[in-house]
Amino acid sequence: MLQSLARCPYPFVWQALAANPHTPPAALRELTTARDSVWNDNRLLRLLAEHPGADHAVLRAVLDAVATKLAEGERPYAAVLSLAGRLELEADELRKLGTFQGTSARLRHLLDLRLSARIR
């Protein structure tokens, strides 16, 4: 049932699925390509990055989507910082997010703080 809802055209449904801890990774993976508006897309990516059931494939897809948004000049900063807290992803992969033109000095600083806290 949750898998079929991921194909729904409504962003509030996508966000509800991404916030539901019982949503399976396959449905989460499908949500990584959902697009609506800048605000809704960035919120969805943050929710996916924070989801307790997100596996490596889901997190990798979120990472790729966030990188694309940064390259386009958008600011999915909350998703970047949420990804930085996920140990399933390599710190070097995440550190690259700070090199995009769309990142601010503050985001780079917070990203470095989160990644350095992971090492300890």
How would you describe each model-predicted region?
Residues 1-120:
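Alpha-helical scaffold segments
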